[in-house]
Design a protein with these regions (language model features):
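Local cysteine-cluster metal-coordination motifs and their immediate loop/turn environment
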Residues: 212-230, 236-239
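Conserved small/polar residues in nucleotide/adenosyl-binding loops
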Residues: 240-247
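Ferredoxin-reductase
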Residues: 2-85
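FNR/FR-type flavoprotein reductase catalytic core
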Residues: 75-213
Length: 251
């Protein structure tokens, strides 16, 4: 069920350069949300008609709260960084398909996140509730690493080599000799392409969350379409979780 709800900001803090963490109190959306889904936040500036899609980092279903971790990338997200406790914000959600947690039950699961694709892996790790392998890739400065370390077996890669393995998440997989039965991943296309190739090579099912520019967030406007081998070229699949080696032509 997707609803538009006026919510209240509980707290917000900067956790890395240009990266912000916000807890939002909701009456309905938190109870319906699943790991890997996202919400759309609406601007109060009338000149910005389209909402901004942001993935869910943590979901407190009993407490009716959502945590988002986002990068300031333009005027819309810059507006959100000024929100403080007690401010109201309109959100639409939950949107997209959550990761198929049942596919990981009783298996060795590796979660792989790159850049701003890192945050949704946190709730995914919590919902799996097992000793999950977590690979996080950063450009330089780390964020959420303490939370991930508490949620599973954390492995880090940084492009500048300042922490963990120098390189990307696939470099960490190879250098740390990591193995898994199932992979869940979210991040930029080059990373997902490398994970797809790895999954094909090893025969590992890979479920991916794609990052695409979008407008409506519900698949009606076709702004987020991606080519697929299983559906026509105009079917919306972004932020839908797909088996990478069976479905995506562009990866």
């Amino acid at each position: 069920m997707k609803i538009k709800e006026c919510c209240t900001v509980e707290s917000q803090e900067c956790i890395a350069k240009g990266i912000y963490s916000m807890w939002i109190s909701t009456k309905v959306i938190a109870k319906e949300a699943k790991a890997g889904q996202f919400i759309s936040l609406f601007s109060k500036d009338g000149s910005r008609l389209l909402p901004r899609p942001i993935s869910l980092c943590e979901i407190d279903r009993e407490g009716g709260r959502l945590r988002i971790v986002y990068r300031v990338a333009g005027a819309g997200t810059e507006e959100f960084l000024h929100l403080k406790a007690g401010d109201e914000v309109d959100i639409l959600g939950p949107l997209g398909n959550g990761f198929p947690i049942e596919e990981g039950k009783g298996k060795r699961v590796m979660l792989m996140g790159g850049g701003i694709g890192v945050p949704p892996m946190l709730q995914t790790a919590k919902d799996l509730g097992t000793d999950t392998i977590i690979c996080c890739g950063y450009r330089d400065e780390l964020f959420l690493n303490e939370e991930f370390a508490a949620a599973g077996d954390l492995h880090i890669a940084t492009e500048d080599g300042s922490a963990g393995v120098k390189g990307n998440v696939m470099d960490a997989v190879r250098e740390d000799h990591l193995e898994a039965d199932v992979i869940f991943a979210c991040g930029p296309a080059p990373m997902l392409r490398a994970i797809k190739a790895y999954g094909l090579e090893k025969g590992i099912p890979c479920w991916i969350s794609m990052e695409e520019k979008m407008a409506c967030g519900v698949g009606a406007c076709l702004a987020c379409v991606c080519q697929s081998t299983e559906v026509d070229g105009h079917s919306p699949v972004s932020y839908t979780h797909l088996r990478a080696h069976e479905t995506l032509m562009n990866l």
